[in-house]
Amino acid sequence: VGNGSPRYFLSLDQQLFRSNFAQTVILSKDLEGRERIVERLRKILAEDFPGIRARANRVALGPPVSYPVQFRVSGTDIPKVKEIADQVAEAMRASPHTLDVNHEWGVRAPMLRVDVDQDKARALGVSTASVSRALQGAISGATVAQFRENDRLIDIVLRAPEAERDAMERVLAVQVPTASGRSVPVTQVATVREAFEEPILWRRSRELTLTVRADIVDGVQAPDVAMAIDRQLAELRAQLPVGYRIEIGGSLEESGRAQESINAGMPLMLAA
């Protein structure tokens, strides 16, 4: 819970640490049992947990990829990148061979935006860092010590009670220490407001990049599905503004890289 499993298998796609993620590895007794588990899990997850994104997949051989079919949209402006990505997703959903089309940025998440009034902060001897630490300690908590249990070190975290962390009015009452040793409410030096933002923004070669991804139905090959969708995106590519592009990824790209490495050594083997 909170991250992926250890790399027990070379082709396993490693996952970043994040609180909204969990992964389970299930070992079946035989091939038939594995197929029954996959079918049953997919049915249960679709019917009983419609509000989450869940996958029941077989461990695949080959280069590690998160999703077999992927298209990357790169550009400079977040809204424009998302607009193009939505059109790519629409083309992917139109394919009868794709499942669970989504993009890696995820849905916009609620957050608290804090705008520090630098003039007031300087007058009271408050720094932006002290405002950040006070709010972080009240909401997420601050590690104040560690407890040793056998060979494990467990962090001791100090934070406000759950009822206070979830109430906006309690957050606004958080006290921020000043240079004189006194404390002032955070609202005296900053404006705190609720907003929504992207939970994560990926970049590739320093460019904003949003990857649209999909699983595939059984009985088809990912490169074939990706190439068919890629042909459908030709018109969209021709209309892209300057500085924006759509690139193919997933299994097709990784297979191409693997083939290039094989081809690079081929002349040497023939010469030998």
Task: Please state what every model-predicted region is.
Residues V1-P64, D119-G141:
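Solvent-exposed, membrane-proximal periplasmic/extracellular interface segments of envelope transport
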Residues P6-Y8, S66-V69, P110, I156:
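Surface-exposed aromatic
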Residues L10-S11, V65-D77, Q118-D119, A160:
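Short, low-order "capping/linker" segments at domain edges
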Residues Q14-F21, R53-P68, R72-S74, N102-A109, ...:
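Flexible hinge/switch segments at interdomain interfaces of large molecular machines
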Residues F21-I26, P68-R72, L112-V114, T211-R213:
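Active-site-flanking beta-strand signature of metal-NTP-handling nucleotidyl enzymes
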Residues L31-E32, S74-V81:
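Short, surface-exposed ligand-recognition loops at beta-strand->loop->(often short) alpha-helix junctions
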Residues F71, A85-V88:
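Cysteine-centered nucleophilic/redox motifs
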Residues K82, A89-M269:
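Extracytoplasmic/periplasmic membrane-proximal domains and adjacent transmembrane bundles
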